[in-house]
Design a protein with these regions (language model features):
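Active-site microenvironment of metallo-dependent hydrolases
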Residues: 1-24, 29, 39, 335-427
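Divalent metal-coordination and catalytic microenvironments
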Residues: 9, 26, 31, 53, ...
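Active-site gating loops and adjacent loop-to-helix segments of metal-dependent hydrolytic enzymes
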Residues: 71-103, 137-145, 214-241, 261-264, ...
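Alpha-helical scaffold segments that flank or form the walls of functional sites
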Residues: 73-139, 160-170, 419-427
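Metal-coordinating catalytic core of metallo-dependent amide/deamination hydrolases
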Residues: 129-248
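Catalytic core of soluble alpha/beta enzymes
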Residues: 212-236, 240-242, 247-260, 273-284, ...
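His/Asp/Glu-enriched, well-ordered alpha-helical/loop segment
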Residues: 234-241, 283-368, 384-386
Length: 427
């Protein structure tokens, strides 16, 4: 790895108290941030990045997605959630193969890098191909083999555990692996207990969908005589570090349970809106002290992987439904997309720009019409910034994109392969 000097840059460190340091310098030695501020005497660099009209900040963290679902972007549109899932997506996923998932993963990683995401949490299939894509492209990821009960469930669970044994803390520790029972409606109680028991043997983190729809909640109440989070607590899932995606219909009691067990909630505002599933009570979650992170969900239900869009939605939606413009602040949403995501995914020393932390960083080009006048760059990031403003992306001290040019992905090859894969898959 090389030493990088970023000169004369405005820097949002996200350390407390949160502020922007104007016209500063940041050094990277190997994969770590070596200084913020004055350039130390004797610091030797292999590369200089001019930070003029740029804002340096921690890379964005997409804490819930389904990477290769980019293959189904714009495929199942304007239908209700259960039609979308049962009649369109699940039958299409039955046709997936390793090659499909590899190229779908590469496409999604390219989209994420281009829009400032440096880490993501994925649950999907053919996870070896996702791992291969992560290793090749240089991004950081928590991956998992999603499992459901039913036919071949034991085989799928074994695959999930094998993925952990083979890939956890690999690729210079950029890849971690968690356990991913899909949801309470797709995993019966016996299977969930088995997943939890096997995950405990390896101390695996859990990533699961929870309380995404009203129907899911009502069915759980009817079948188990309790709400979804109560049900999972009763099964012992929260004895393991857990993050739950969506949480749209969490009750006060459920939030208290999640807080007690330090369970993170991954808010997916764009996907929840598009599928008509509602708006999560994020303000209440934050007031109760829950760790709330952000995700895009898959590109089949969003239909992009743009975390700047999720930051914007996470802010304005809560202001709107609360009828209170100060119910949530822009900086809260930025933290959801950075430090809170790092906490949810157990990413230590990531999410802030400070000496000794891992260098997962992005540079935003603020020399754009929608950034002027520059009264408040934090507000600019929340309410004005676009995915295309991402100029440079660094993960683990390695530059993955410089001045908008992807350095680890042949994007024209990706476009060619994706059209070929989609045609074979959905013809």
């Amino acid at each position: 790895m090389s030493n990088i000097l970023i000169k004369n840059v405005d820097c949002l460190t996200l350390t407390e108290p949160v502020k922007i340091i104007k016209n500063t310098n940041v050094g990277i030695s190997d994969n770590l941030i070596s200084f913020v501020g004055k350039i130390p005497a004797g610091f030797k660099h292999d590369e200089i990045i001019d930070g003029k009209n740029k804002l340096l900040m921690p890379g964005l963290i997409n804490a819930h997605t389904h990477l290769a679902m980019s293959l189904f972007r714009n495929y199942a549109e304007d239908v209700d959630f259960w039609t979308w899932l049962n009649d369109k997506i699940l039958p299409a996923e039955e046709k997936l193969n390793r090659e499909n998932v590899y190229w779908g993963s590469i496409l999604s990683i390219a989209e994420m890098i281009k829009s400032g995401t440096t880490s993501f949490a994925d649950m999907y299939f053919f996870t070896e191909e996702t791992a291969k894509a992560v290793e090749e492209t240089g991004i950081r990821a928590m991956i998992s083999r999603s499992v459901v009960s039913g036919e071949n469930s034991d085989k799928k669970l074994k695959e999930s555990l094998d993925i952990f044994d083979k890939y956890n803390n690999t690729a210079d520790e950029r890849i971690t692996v968690c356990s991913a029972p899909h949801a309470i409606y797709s995993c019966d109680e016996i299977f969930l207990k088995e997943v939890i028991a096997e995950s405990k043997k390896r101390n695996m983190q859990i990533h699961i969908h929870l309380s995404e729809t009203e129907e899911e909640v009502n069915n759980c109440k009817t079948k188990h005589l309790m709400y979804p989070a109560e049900y999972l607590q009763n099964l012992g899932m929260f004895d393991l570090k857990t993050m739950v995606a969506h949480g749209v219909y969490l009750t006060d009691k459920e939030m208290d349970i999640l807080k007690k067990y330090d369970v993170s909630v991954i808010h997916n505002p764009g996907s929840n809106l598009k599928l008509g599933n509602g708006i999560a009570p994020v303000v209440k979650m934050l007031k109760k002290g829950l760790n709330v992170a952000l995700g895009t969900d898959g590109a089949a239900s969003n239909n992009n992987l743009n975390m700047f869009e999720e930051i914007y939605l996470a802010t304005v939606l809560q202001k709107g439904i609360m009828k209170n413009s100060i119910a949530i602040k822009g900086i809260d949403a930025i933290k959801m997309a950075t430090v809170n995501g790092a906490r949810a995914m157990s990413l230590n020393n990531i999410g802030t720009v400070e000496k000794g932390n891992i260098a997962d960083l992005i540079l935003i080009d603020t020399d754009k019409p929608h950034f002027y006048p520059k009264f408040d760059l934090i507000s600019d990031l929340v309410y004005s910034a676009q995915a295309g403003d991402t100029d440079t992306v660094i993960v683990n001290g390695k530059i993955l994109m410089k001045h908008g040019n992807l350095l680890t992905i042949d994007i024209e090859r990706v476009y060619f392969e994706i059209e070929k894969q989609a045609e074979k898959l959905l013809k």
